Curated annotation (Swiss-Prot):
Forms an icosahedral capsid with a T=7 symmetry and a 50 nm diameter. The capsid is composed of 72 pentamers linked to each other by disulfide bonds and associated with L2 proteins. Binds to heparan sulfate proteoglycans on cell surface of basal layer keratinocytes to provide initial virion attachment. This binding mediates a conformational change in the virus capsid that facilitates efficient infection. The virion enters the host cell via endocytosis. During virus trafficking, L1 protein dissociates from the viral DNA and the genomic DNA is released to the host nucleus. GO terms for cellular component: host cell nucleus; T=7 icosahedral viral capsid. This is Major capsid protein L1. GO terms for molecular function: structural molecule activity. It holds the Pfam family Late_protein_L1.
């Protein structure tokens, strides 16, 4: 009797212990009735929209770059609730519990009018117009410089990401080639790179999320504001799939783009066009005999900016986060990543450079004026935070230790080392030259894990208040849950009396 057997291979053995399940914060975090409001001041930024202005003598930045296409990454620092002087032991038992902040709601305020800001390049690689050509382009001769002064408006983008860890971005960059290395002038291999989004980095403006420092060596393929920059795009696929959900509690995103013009690049096309199957050979005496370029590209445009589709200047209430972390601000901090180029107006400032004042007899000369560009931004953030308790039982501590051991270190919880075995040496004059060098004392302060990154750090440790009715966002929070004591018009009371009818007595 013939039997069919499966192809022999490696035997799969399941793990001896069940895989640990990631707990949601709602399973072990206990909310309290203490709710606080905090917020920032009106935060203003002024700078040049395209690049940093550097002093040639001292090599210091005199005017920083400030563009509406930059990421604003705010790192909000909260006070440690475990250091509060709370007398009521029914609310918090420091021997068995620890306090954390939970995000209930926030509002990201943006000031200023809506506006479109343009960017461009005085030497932009644009050989010809391929949208509505009137004649076939001439042959590119060696040594020609066909770069033009071109400007455009960027892709329209509104974005905010809220989490207790910084957001992750992605961009395309040059990869290390395999052996043998490609010839000089060949297209390099590229790879997708993930990195933390920092404050001041550029977002995608319509030319892709790429490292234009390495991918465009001619320095003329993109506008000035991203020529020497890395344009990043938030890696939402990775952050929303994170098992702990610390980087994204929730996010809002709106993009809008269309193609305004169609151009072709100047230069030699590196990838040869196949001879057969794509076109028929032209006549030898026609301009088409010298095949034109085919490295086509569009110029982006964000089109109309309207207040009807704004993501900012409105409250957001967090009821259920996307991941396992339902708004718990581990480390007493919150990261808010923002992009908004709908308020992207660049102020044009003209300054008369001559010593004499301008009077009625002056005749205009353009060389008498210097032109400057400045971009301004205005932000304000309001938060509603609830105080919550975390029980210090073994299951919760084991889960937190696997998730982030820094949480236990911040709570001053650690394993007790065993007592020393035997007697140890202790020198009296250990700092003198007669003895050996003292051992290095370890640093007791925990090192900041984000010290190598650039964030807009905002200290809110002294800006908390439990008087929610005194703040705009606090009033809306109380009104949402029916806790706001509003004045009601008293109802008028009317007393109705029934009149009794008197019956006449019938007489005989």
């Amino acid at each position: 009797m013939a039997l069919w057997l499966q192809t022999a291979g490696q035997l799969y053995l399941p793990p001896s212990k069940p895989v640990a399940r990631v707990l949601s914060t709602d399973e072990y975090v206990q909310p309290t009735n203490l709710v606080f409001h905090t917020g920032t001041d009106r935060m203003l930024i002024v700078g040049h929209p395209y690049f940093d202005i550097i002093d040639s003598g001292s090599n210091n930045i005199t005017v920083p770059k400030c563009s509406g296409n930059q990421f604003r990454v705010m790192r909000l620092l909260f006070p440690d609730p475990n250091k509060f002087a709370m007398i009521d032991r029914a609310v918090f038992n420091p021997e068995r519990e620890r306090l954390v902040w939970r995000l209930e709601g926030l509002e990201i305020g943006r000031g200023g009018p809506l506006g479109i800001g343009t960017s461009g390049h005085p030497l932009f690689n644009k050989y010809g117009d391929t949208e509505n050509p009137a004649a076939y382009p001439l042959k590119q001769n060696n040594g020609d410089d066909n770069r033009m002064d071109v400007s455009m408006d960027p892709k329209q983008m509104q974005l905010f990401i809220v989490g207790c860890k910084p957001a992750t971005g992605e961009h395309w960059d040059i990869a290390k080639p395999c052996d043998p290395a490609p010839a000089k002038g060949s297209c390099p291999p590229i790879k997708l790179t993930q990195s933390i989004i920092q404050d001041g980095e550029m977002c995608d403006t319509g030319f892709g999320n790429a490292n234009f420092i390495t991918l465009q060596e001619d320095k003329s393929g993109v506008p000035l504001d991203i020529t020497n920059e890395i344009c990043k795009y938030p890696d939402l696929l990775k952050m929303t799939k994170d098992i702990y959900g610390d980087a994204v509690f929730f996010f809002g995103k709106r993009e809008q783009i269309y193609s305004r013009h169609y151009f072709v690049r100047g230069g030699i096309d590196g990838d040869s066009l196949p001879d057969s199957g794509y076109y028929l050979a032209p006549q030898t005496d026609k301009p088409q005999n010298n095949l034109g370029g085919y490295s086509y590209f569009p110029t982006p445009s964000g089109s109309v900016a309207s207040s009807d589709n704004q993501l900012f200047n409105r409250p957001y209430w967090l009821h259920r986060a996307q991941g396992a972390n339902n708004g718990i601000c581990w480390g007493n901090q919150l990261f808010i990543t923002i992009v908004d180029n709908t308020r992207n107006t660049n102020l044009s400032i003209s300054v008369y450079k001559q010593d004499a004042a301008i009077d009625n007899r002056y005749k205009y000369k353009q060389e008498d004026f210097r032109q400057y560009l400045r971009h301004t931004e205005e932000y304000e953030v309001e938060l509603i935070l609830r105080l919550c308790k975390v029980p210090l039982n073994p299951d919760v501590l084991a889960h937190l230790n696997v998730m982030d051991k820094n949480i236990l270190e911040d709570w001053q919880l650690s394993f007790v080392p065993p007592p020393p075995q035997g007697i140890e040496d202790a020198y009296r004059y250990i700092m003198s030259q007669a003895t050996m060098c003292p051992t290095d004392v370890p640093n007791t302060e925990r090192e900041d894990p984000y010290k190598q990154y650039t964030f807009w750090t905002i200290d809110l440790q002294e800006r908390f208040s439990n008087e929610l009715s005194q703040f705009s966002l606090g009033k809306r929070y109380l009104y949402q849950y029916g806790l706001l004591n509003g004045r009601k018009r008293s109802a008028s009371s009317f007393v109705t009396k029934k009149s009794k009818t008197v019956k006449r007595k019938r007489t005989k």
